[in-house]
A protein has these predicted regions:
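RNA-interacting cores
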Residues: 1-318
Length: 318
């Protein structure tokens, strides 16, 4: 199992956000990308001093750039192995979110802030209050509630209620080391892929979720998040962990490759989202991997994790 000093930097906080539809609204695109677009636009307007079309004069201190356009130091050696730096947040709508909402219906999603992004909670709350339209025609919505959620202990506290001005600075943070203290379920686990999971290996996306591929992509994501957003790189035997992952067997594969098409208002064209959904069962010496898998449930894994793809749930299978 990873030592505390090796992984102590990894931390996150999770929030449940509820919007109320003031008028009926229809979503032509995946809810995660809709929310990310509306949220990013409002965040930039509120938090970045640059005018539209201009470069930010102080990107190293700008909350928008640190969260949405993360850039490494110019001399960062990590650029050689990281094609894209992950953003320190995840917008995760329910896997079966609706396409249409009536007046009074709730649009609910989870927002995970990772590492230093937790310090920007006030910026996120103010931005969410400014999101006043979603979907086709930007139908009116209002922020109804934000709750801090501890997914490890299954408790929650109110951060904001729509008819109040008070914002409570609640952070029910979860650390990697707290996940490492949770007992491994045994020699068999089941991973349920809840949203399209896009695992890239050997220059292509895999359609068979071999454990070593899943773990490689998860370890790479956690390593990047630690390096760029949590203050320090992970001090781990990466090669040794991957070699051990190759010994874990895929004993049941109930996944399928799925695709669905949604309109992208940002790109003004239809986009196809593809990936694995379903479940896979693995057997082997799994104890060392358990905390990574547990923590990774809230960071997601694979391409598109920032707006909700790569969501999974892990549990014992014995």
């Amino acid at each position: 199992m990873a030592s505390g000093t090796a992984t102590a930097t990894l931390s996150l906080a999770r929030y449940r956000v509820t919007f109320e539809a003031i008028e009926p609204l229809a979503l032509l695109e995946y809810l995660g990308s809709t929310l990310r677009g509306a949220f990013g636009h409002a965040f930039r307007e509120l938090c970045c001093p640059a005018r539209p079309g201009e470069a930010c004069p102080m990107p190293a201190a700008c909350a928008y750039h640190l969260v949405f356009e993360t850039a490494p130091p110019p001399d960062s050696p990590a650029l050689r192995t990281h094609e894209e730096i992950p953003r320190p947040f995840v917008i995760a709508p329910p896997p079966a979110s609706a396409d249409e909402y009536r007046r009074g219906d709730h649009v609910v999603f989870d927002l995970t802030l990772i590492g230093r992004a937790r310090e920007f909670l006030p910026h996120f709350v103010v931005t969410l209050r400014e999101v006043d339209g979603l979907g086709r025609g930007r139908r009116r919505v209002r922020l109804a509630k934000i709750e801090a959620v501890d997914p490890l202990r299954e408790v929650s506290e109110t951060v904001f209620v729509g008819d109040e001005a008070l914002v409570r600075p609640v952070d029910l943070g979860v650390t990697f080391d707290e996940c490492a203290a949770v007992r491994s379920p045994g020699a068999a686990i089941r991973v349920a892929f809840l949203t399209q999971t896009r695992l890239k290996h050997d220059a292509g996306f895999v359609r068979r979720p071999d454990f070593h591929v899943l773990f490689r992509r998860l370890l790479g994501r956690l390593s990047s998040l630690a390096r760029f957003h949590c203050g320090a790189p992970l001090d781990l035997d990466f090669r040794g962990l991957i070699e051990r992952a190759q010994a874990v067997r895929l004993v049941s594969d109930d996944t399928r490759w799925t695709a669905w098409t949604r309109y992208s208002s940002r790109q003004d064209r239809r986009m196809e989202w593809t990936g694995l959904v379903g479940s896979a069962t693995y057997e082997g010496d799994l104890a060392v991997f358990w905390p990574y898998l547990l923590f990774g449930q809230w960071t997601h894994v694979g391409k598109g994790a920032t707006f909700g793809l790569g969501s999974y749930r892990v549990e014992g299978a014995e």
